[in-house]
Structures are given as structure tokens and as C-alpha cells.
């Protein structure tokens, strides 16, 4: 009896079973090597039929026409782009997708290479990119506010009418849940927006830090350029001086060659007679005529103005110098980062290079402390307690801005160093020969100490404790006019009918240490002078008379300065007053807690020394008062700066001198 299901041992049966298993493996696990080989044989067979020669009788023309159509289709750009998109997909994906066009296009567009995925930075954000996108979408806040107001007003109305109305609430549980979900969603969006704002703030802070670093680099570059400019200008001045000396020497030699000997003898006799006359005239101190060097006023202008300090924050310290060993009595400088001259009660007058903070040398010649000085371009005028006035030409100083220590001899003494590293140490003496060619001449006619001076052009005005003002001609080197302040006060009181009192101090408490002439300034024929009686007198140098007196201070005048419209004065009565020169009235006034010892202004600010360890600054543009100096951060740093005695400001570049001999340089 035969079996209902006979077992077949034929190869065809085995191949059928294995074929089913292989097909299952293809669908389940993917391609195998056997399937790839079978697919290759089929492709080879098909290609052999397609590429057979035309002489083959078994070949039909259908294959030839089909290949031509396929070639035309493949040349289309759309088909080529599809082929390239296929190339980005693995064969396994092609088989799994069963060559579906839509799926292949989706995979080609959405697939990202591993290189791009590896470059994605790690993010610690608690929200996703899609949530951030949703949070960045604008919302209608007005509708939300209106609905919130409606709910609040309706709730209040329900509370008010709870006893009158018993109708049920219109909201259902579902609507309340939906409203709660909406509010939770809004709250979630609010949190995401807060995180986004915080991230933006951190990003802005990083950008600001990077910009500050870039700004610092550019500032260092600007400082180097200005230093190079200063060196070049110094070399130009030296070359101009050498050229001028050579021209003078050539003129003198030509004059000596062309002048006969007899004429030289007559000139010698005349010079001897003039010398004898000068010796007789020197007995009268009011008509002493010095024999100075030839005065040649040169209006030197700097070709470039420093602008580095304009890029600092106001109140920033640029440098601090331990300039002297005693209280600063006077100081002045020409331009920011230029040349400064300072004097103190240690009987020294020092010249400083503000660009490097180094001492250039000493101005020696006075026999006592210098009380007042002025720097104008390369000319310096100093007034001393020895009753003399001396003028100096700093362009003749032998000073190298950058002293190359490598090129110096080893046996050279280091006592002539121009700088010092320890600010607390005593400043070392600069080279003794650096300023030996700077003195021009001396003006000696006062009989008491010189307390104030000012020069402009070829005219210098000086005020002394001998109660006189003197006008000097710098070309001839002699006094051309003497103004008696007491006589002028007496004349003014007699004209105004002031009785028999000729000098009437207006101060509440007389100060014996106050200077009789506290400050003065001249411009052409106009002179403003402040004295110990608290009066500001405006003189006309052409007539030698006082044409106006400004009354208002109750203490000695210590400082003044005027421009085209206003005159600003400071006094020991602790006030600073701004006068209108057109009307003679007070335009503005303000006061401090201590007497004013020094004051100066530029186009924007008025700075004053008012008996404190800071400089008092008044901003004229916005009327703001603020402090500048070492005393601002004294408590934080644990230091006790000395009292500020003298201040100078030009173009926002502030210098202040203190009682301990320290000079601070600030931006203002």
C-alpha cells in the first residue's frame, strides 16, 4: 500500500525546499552571498542577449530599440538626480524598500552622513529644538489678557451675587481641564522663553568679553603708535635745533669776516661802556636789565595729538609718579602724554616724560622753592620764592625717549638712570647734563616771592607778595609796566565813594598764609587778577587801569581761568563761582566742604582740589558732580592717599599733585 505522502529524494525537491528557506532568509535577514551570485548570473545572461551582435539570427530588434529608449531616458537631468540619490542608499535598503520611489526619495532627503552627526555639539538644554521653535512663535497676548480680565471680573461678580443668584456655573469639567491644559502649555512656553533669554544673555556676555579683548589689543597697538610718534617728533625737534644752530654759526662767521678790525674795536669799547652803565643801573632793582640769550619765540605745534586717553573710561588711572619728597607747589604740562614740569617744597623743579613716566632732568637755577610755573609748547616759565622769574627752552634738552640699556657701557654709573621701578623709593637723579642748555634768561625786579604768573606770546605778567603786578617784554627781557594793586584799590574806592578805607578785606576770617596775588591770566591787553581780599579785578594793560571789579567771594582768591564768555574763580571760602564776562554777574556757583586750592577747566569739565584725597569734577554738560582720584577706592584697597593740592586738565587728561609729592595721572 502506497504512502499518502511519498517522500521525494530527487534534487528538484530538495532545491524547492531550500529555495523556500532562502526566500524566507532574504525577506527576514537580508541578502546572502549565494543570492548575490545568482543575481549576477542573471544580469550577465541578460546583458549577453542585449549586447549580442546584429548578425545573430536569434536576436530580435526589440532589445535594440529598448536600449535606445533607455539611453535617451538616462540623459534627462531628473533621471540622473534620481540615480545619484540611489547611490547614497545601501543595497540592503534598496532591497528592503522593494524599489519604492517615494521611500527612496524620502531616505535620500532625510538621511544624514555620520560626519555631520559627529559635529553636532552637546547641549544641556532642557527643551528640544521644536519646543524652542514653538516658543519663538508670537502669541496673541491681548486675547489672553482680555480673557483673564473676563474671568476675574466674572469671578468677582459671582462672589458679589452669590447670595442673589443660584444658577449653575456655565463651565463643565471638560472645559476646565482644557483651560488648565492651555495654561500649563503657556506656563511651559514661558519657562522655555526664559531659558532662551538666559542663553541669549550668556551669548551676549561672551561676545562682549571677546570684543573687550579685541579692544584691549587695539589700545595696545594705539599706545605703541603714539609712542613712536613721540619719538619721531623728538627727533624732528632736535634736527631743527641743530639746523638753527648751524645757521646762526654761519651768520656769525660771515659777519666776522665782513667786519673790519677797527669797527670791532669800537664795538668793544661801546660794549664796555654799556656794561658799566648796566652795572650802575643794577643798583636800582626796579630797573635791573638782564643780559639774556636772544629770545626767539617759536610757535611750535605738535603735528599729532594723542588720543589714547579718550578711549578709557572716565576716572581710570593712567599712571602714578612718586615725583617729589615734599608737597607739590605747582605743575603744568603741554599736551596729553607730552611733557610735564613739577615743583615742590623740596626746592626742585623736575621735567617729566608723561608718555613713559620718566624724569627727563632738573631745571636748576632758582635759590628757593618754585611757587608757580607755566608750560607752553617748549617754553617753561617759573616763578620762585627768591623773587625771580626764569624761562627755559625744553627743546634743547638732551634726552632720549628710549634709553637702550644694552648699548651702554658696563662701567657707566647707573646713578644717572632716568626711571625707577619701585614707586615708594626716592627718585634717582637723572643725568646732570640733560638740561644744561635749557636756561634762556632770568627776570628780576620783584622784591618778594613770585606767587602767580602767566605768559602769552611775547608778554608775561607776574604777581608778587610785594603787592605789585609786572608786565614783561620777553623780546627785550625787561619790565615794561608795573601795576600797584593797592593804589588801584584806593582809586576804585575813592571813585565809588567808599570812605577812607582803601583796602577792605571781605573774608570772614583773615588768612595770613594766603597769597596777596593768588592767580592771574592775561590775553592780549586784558588781564584778570584775583587777590587776597576776595576781589577779581579786570585790568586794561594799555592804560594800566582797572575797568571792572567782580565782588562775590568772601575769602582769598586762589585760582582763576577765563575763556571767551565765562570766568571761573576758586577761593578759600570753599566756593567756585562762574562769572559772565559780558554782564559781570554770577552765572553759576557751587561749594565744597573745604577751601579750594587749585582749579582748572577744559571744554567739558571743571576740576578742583578742595582739601580732600580726590579731585572734585563738575561736568558742565549735564551738571553732574563726581570724584576722581586714588581716594575713590581707598577703602577697598586699604590705603590712605594724601590730600590733593594742585590739579591740571587738558582735553580730558587730568594730573593731580598731592601733599606727599605724588602725582597721579587720570582720564577725566
From Swiss-Prot:
Q: Where is the composition biased (Polar residues)?
A: 7-17
Keywords on record = Coiled coil, Membrane, Mitochondrion, Mitochondrion outer membrane, Repeat, WD repeat
**Ranges for region Disordered:** 1-32, 137-178, 403-438
Subcellular compartments: Mitochondrion outer membrane
SUPFAM superfamilies xrefs? WD40 repeat-like (SSF50978)
- Biological process (GO), any one: mitochondrial fission
- Stretches of Basic residues bias are at 145-155
Residue spans making up a coiled coil are 193-259
Q: How does it sit in the membrane?
A: Peripheral membrane protein
Could you tell me where the Acidic residues compositional bias lies?
409-419
Give the GO cellular component terms, alphabetically.
mitochondrial outer membrane
Give the CDD domains listed for this entry: Mdv1_N, WD40
Q: Which Pfam families match?
A: WD40
- Give start and end residues of every WD repeat: 323-364, 365-402, 445-484, 490-549, 552-591, 593-628, 634-668
Q: Which InterPro entries match?
A: G-protein_beta_WD-40_rep (IPR020472), WD40/YVTN_repeat-like_dom_sf (IPR015943), WD40_repeat_CS (IPR019775), WD40_repeat_dom_sf (IPR036322), WD40_rpt (IPR001680)
Keyword hit for Transferase: no
Domain of life (superkingdom): Eukaryota
What the record says about family reads:
Belongs to the WD repeat MDV1/CAF4 family.
PANTHER family associated with the record: CCR4-ASSOCIATED FACTOR 4, WD40 REPEAT PROTEIN 12, 37
Q: What does this protein do?
A: Involved in mitochondrial fission. Acts as an adapter protein required to form mitochondrial fission complexes. Formation of these complexes is required to promote constriction and fission of the mitochondrial compartment at a late step in mitochondrial division.
> What is this protein's record name?
Mitochondrial division protein 1
Amino acid at each position: 500500500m502506497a504512502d499518502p505522502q511519498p517522500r521525494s529524494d530527487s534534487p528538484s525537491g530538495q532545491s524547492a525546499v531550500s529555495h523556500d528557506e532562502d526566500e524566507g532568509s532574504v525577506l527576514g535577514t537580508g541578502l546572502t552571498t549565494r543570492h548575490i551570485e545568482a543575481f549576477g548570473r542573471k544580469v550577465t545572461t541578460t546583458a549577453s542577449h542585449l549586447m549580442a551582435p546584429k548578425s545573430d539570427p536569434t536576436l530580435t530588434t526589440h532589445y535594440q530599440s529598448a536600449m535606445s529608449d533607455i539611453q535617451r531616458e538616462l540623459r534627462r537631468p531628473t533621471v540622473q538626480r534620481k540615480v545619484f540619490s540611489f547611490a547614497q542608499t545601501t543595497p540592503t535598503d534598496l532591497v528592503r524598500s522593494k524599489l519604492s520611489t517615494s521611500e527612496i526619495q524620502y531616505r535620500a532627503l532625510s538621511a544624514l552622513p555620520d560626519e555631520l552627526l559627529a559635529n553636532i555639539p552637546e547641549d544641556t538644554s532642557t527643551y528640544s529644538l521644536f519646543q524652542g521653535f514653538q516658543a519663538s512663535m508670537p502669541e496673541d497676548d491681548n486675547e489672553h489678557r482680555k480673557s483673564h480680565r473676563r474671568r476675574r471680573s466674572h469671578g468677582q461678580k459671582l462672589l458679589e451675587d452669590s447670595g442673589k443668584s443660584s444658577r449653575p456655573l456655565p463651565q463643565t469639567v471638560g472645559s476646565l481641564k482644557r483651560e488648565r491644559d492651555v495654561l500649563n502649555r503657556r506656563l511651559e512656553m514661558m519657562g522655555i522663553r526664559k531659558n532662551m533669554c538666559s542663553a541669549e544673555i550668556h551669548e551676549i556676555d561672551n561676545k562682549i568679553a571677546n570684543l573687550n579683548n579685541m579692544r584691549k589689543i587695539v589700545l595696545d597697538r594705539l599706545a605703541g603708535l603714539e609712542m613712536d610718534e613721540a619719538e619721531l617728533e623728538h627727533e624732528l625737534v632736535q634736527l631743527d635745533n641743530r639746523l638753527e644752530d648751524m645757521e646762526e654759526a654761519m651768520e656769525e662767521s660771515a659777519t666776522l669776516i665782513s667786519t673790519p678790525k677797527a669797527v670791532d674795536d669800537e664795538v668793544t669799547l661801546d660794549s664796555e661802556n654799556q656794561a658799566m652803565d648796566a652795572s650802575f643801573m643794577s643798583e636800582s632793582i626796579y630797573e635791573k636789565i638782564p643780559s639774556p640769550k636772544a629770545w626767539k619765540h617759536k610757535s611750535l605745534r605738535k603735528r599729532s595729538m594723542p588720543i589714547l586717553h579718550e578711549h578709557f573710561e572716565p576716572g581710570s588711572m593712567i599712571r602714578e609718579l612718586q615725583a617729589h619728597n615734599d608737597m607739590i607747589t605747582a605743575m603744568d604740562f603741554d599736551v596729553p602724554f607730552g611733557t610735564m614740569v613739577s615743583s615742590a617744597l623740596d626746592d626742585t623743579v623736575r621735567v617729566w616724560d608723561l608718555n613713559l613716566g620718566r624724569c627727563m632732568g632738573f631745571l636748576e637755577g632758582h635759590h628757593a622753592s618754585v611757587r608757580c610755573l607755566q608750560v607752553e609748547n617748549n617754553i617753561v616759565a617759573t616763578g620762585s620764592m627768591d623773587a625771580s622769574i626764569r624761562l627755559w627752552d625744553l627743546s634743547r634738552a638732551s634726552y632720549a625717549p628710549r634709553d637702550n640699556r644694552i648699548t651702554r657701557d658696563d662701567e657707566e654709573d647707573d646713578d644717572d638712570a632716568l626711571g625707577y621701578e619701585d614707586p615708594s623709593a626716592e627718585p634717582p637723579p637723572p643725568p646732570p647734563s640733560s638740561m644744561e642748555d635749557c636756561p634762556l634768561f632770568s627776570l628780576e625786579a620783584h622784591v618778594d616771592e613770585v606767587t602767580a604768573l602767566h605768559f602769552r606770546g611775547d608778554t608775561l605778567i607776574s604777581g608778587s607778595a610785594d603787592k605789585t603786578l609786572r608786565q614783561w617784554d620777553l623780546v627785550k627781557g625787561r619790565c615794561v609796566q608795573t601795576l600797584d594793586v593797592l593804589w588801584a584799590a584806593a582809586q576804585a574806592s575813592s571813585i565809588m565813594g567808599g570812605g577812607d578805607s582803601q583796602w577792605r578785606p571781605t573774608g570772614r576770617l583773615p588768612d595770613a598764609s594766603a597769597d596777596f596775588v593768588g592767580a592771574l591770566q592775561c590775553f592780549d591787553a586784558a588781564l584778570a587778577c584775583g587777590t587776597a581780599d576776595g576781589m577779581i579785578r579786570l585790568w586794561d594793560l594799555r592804560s594800566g587801569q582797572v575797568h571792572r571789579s567782580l565782588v562775590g567771594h568772601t575769602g582769598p582768591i586762589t585760582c582763576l581761568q577765563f575763556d571767551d564768555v565765562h570766568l571761573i574763580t576758586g577761593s578759600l571760602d570753599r566756593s567756585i563761582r562762574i562769572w559772565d564776562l559780558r554782564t559781570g554777574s554770577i552765572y553759576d556757583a557751587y561749594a565744597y566742604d573745604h577751601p579750594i586750592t587749585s582749579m582748572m577747566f577744559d571744554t567739558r569739565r571743571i576740576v578742583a582740589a578742595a582739601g580732600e584725597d580726590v579731585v572734585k569734577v563738575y561736568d558742565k554738560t549735564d551738571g553732574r558732580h563726581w570724584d576722581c582720584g586714588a581716594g575713590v577706592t581707598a577703602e577697598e584697597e586699604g590705603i590712605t592717599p594724601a590730600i590733593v593740592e594742585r590739579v591740571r586738565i587738558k582735553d580730558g587728561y587730568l594730573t593731580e599733585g598731592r601733599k606727599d609729592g605724588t602725582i597721579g595721572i587720570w582720564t577725566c
